[in-house]
């Protein structure tokens, strides 16, 4: 029950966040090449952790705000298993563009889920005070016209 409530809160927050006007600028000018590489690496590392069912590692790439919402790595991984199957067990992942929004960088990925359907994953990134990048949320949309 707690996981379902947390998932609903996270999904509602992401929906509200996305409903605001966003500035979409390809390849954010305020991000250095090392920042862009770090963002890619953080997301790939979390995807790799999901493949290993390494809850602690996957959880470590989430921002403190996200970690606080789920309480521990086990709850976080359970939420991903239930609500984000395409990124939990993707058949394929292709990194697309990194766009700048008024809420921060959004790394777009094209994912083929285990069901064979195509999805677009938006990874919202946040730079921490120590200079590292962490995942501040993810939302998925299904590409209705693309099945594999």
Residue ranges and their predicted role:
Residues 1-10:
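Bacterial N-terminal signal peptides that target proteins for export
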Residues 9-19:
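Bacterial N-terminal signal peptides
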Residues 23-52:
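Short, low-complexity N-terminal intrinsically disordered segments enriched in polar/charged residues
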Residues 30, 37-41, 55-102:
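Short solvent-exposed beta->alpha transition segments
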Residues 45-49, 72-76, 135:
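A generic structural signal for ordered secondary structure
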Residues 97-148:
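Exposed beta-sheet edge and beta->alpha loop/turn motif
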């Amino acid at each position: 029950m707690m996981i379902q409530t947390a998932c609903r809160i996270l999904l509602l927050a992401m929906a509200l966040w996305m409903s605001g006007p966003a500035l979409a600028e390809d390849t954010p000018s305020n991000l250095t090449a090392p920042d862009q590489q770090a963002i890619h690496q953080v997301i790939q590392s979390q995807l790799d952790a999901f493949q290993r069912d390494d809850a602690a590692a996957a959880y470590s790439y989430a921002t403190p705000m996200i970690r606080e919402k789920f309480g521990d790595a086990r709850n976080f991984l359970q939420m991903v298993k239930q609500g984000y199957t395409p990124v939990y067990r993707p058949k394929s992942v292709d990194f697309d563009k990194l766009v700048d929004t008024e809420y921060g960088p959004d790394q777009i990925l094209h994912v083929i889920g285990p069901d064979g359907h195509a999805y677009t994953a938006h990874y919202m990134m946040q730079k921490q005070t120590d200079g590292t990048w962490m995942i501040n949320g993810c939302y998925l949309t299904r590409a209705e016209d693309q099945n594999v």
